[in-house]
Amino acid sequence: MELNKYIDHTLLKPTASEKDIIKICNEAKEYHFASVCVNPCNVSLVRKELKGSDVKVCSVISFPFGASSTEVKVEEAKKAIEAGAEEIDMVINVGKLLEGDLEYTQNEVSAITKACHEKNVLLKVIVETCYLEEKNIADICAIIEKAGADFIKTSTGYGSRGASVEDIKLFKKYLKKDTKIKASGGVRTREDAETYIGLGCSRIGASSGIAIVTGK
């Protein structure tokens, strides 16, 4: 199994320096990871560092709390795309989903999907499963499929826990179309990654991508 092609090599710490960003770009090129995932302020640097490689540029949006308005999220996504993002990982407004405001959540996910797809940019929707009950997962799966987003993603890594096997099983239970799954948060070993891929995940978000692919 070519684990490297599943890895979004991730650095989202607020303390990340330019030197740190260049380092993960070099690592991603060496190991041919799927993407480098960073905060929006670092997208242009990542684009420059990855130029000519097979590694995609990925930016998070409204990270880590998803608490920006829909309008701000759309604008942030557009700016990240202008700066060179080829993939967007957007955090939903979890509070709106939990209180049952499905119209708000649908409008938000649909608006970001439209902004991304107009520029042929892939969208991953982060739902922060640590806060969700099964009903919430069923609702957000239906919303994401209706919007036409490309991926559902478990976690930011900043919640009370990261991905779990049960999360992925519930996604598989409620996703009826071709929406892909990204496991993120707490995926640190080769065994972890192989477990999630075996359950049907198409991407793994991790800051420990090298340890995952080398087993060291």
Curated annotation (Swiss-Prot):
Its annotated pathway reads: Carbohydrate degradation; 2-deoxy-D-ribose 1-phosphate degradation; D-glyceraldehyde 3-phosphate and acetaldehyde from 2-deoxy-alpha-D-ribose 1-phosphate: step 2/2
Name the Enzyme Commission number(s) assigned to this protein: 4.1.2.4
Task: List GO terms (cellular component aspect).
Answer: cytoplasm
Q: Name one GO biological process term.
A: 2-deoxyribose 1-phosphate catabolic process
Give the subcellular location: Cytoplasm
Q: Which GO terms describe its molecular function?
A: deoxyribose-phosphate aldolase activity
Reactions accelerated catalytically: 2-deoxy-D-ribose 5-phosphate = D-glyceraldehyde 3-phosphate + acetaldehyde
Alphabetized, the UniProt keywords read: Cytoplasm, Lyase, Schiff base
Q: Tell me the domain of life.
A: Bacteria
Q: Where is the signal peptide?
A: none
In the UniProt entry, which residues are flagged as the active site?
89 (proton donor/acceptor), 153 (schiff-base intermediate with acetaldehyde), 182 (proton donor/acceptor)
Broad EC category: lyase
> Per its database record, what is this protein's job?
Catalyzes a reversible aldol reaction between acetaldehyde and D-glyceraldehyde 3-phosphate to generate 2-deoxy-D-ribose 5-phosphate.
Family affiliation: Belongs to the DeoC/FbaB aldolase family. DeoC type 1 subfamily.
Protein name as catalogued: Deoxyribose-phosphate aldolase
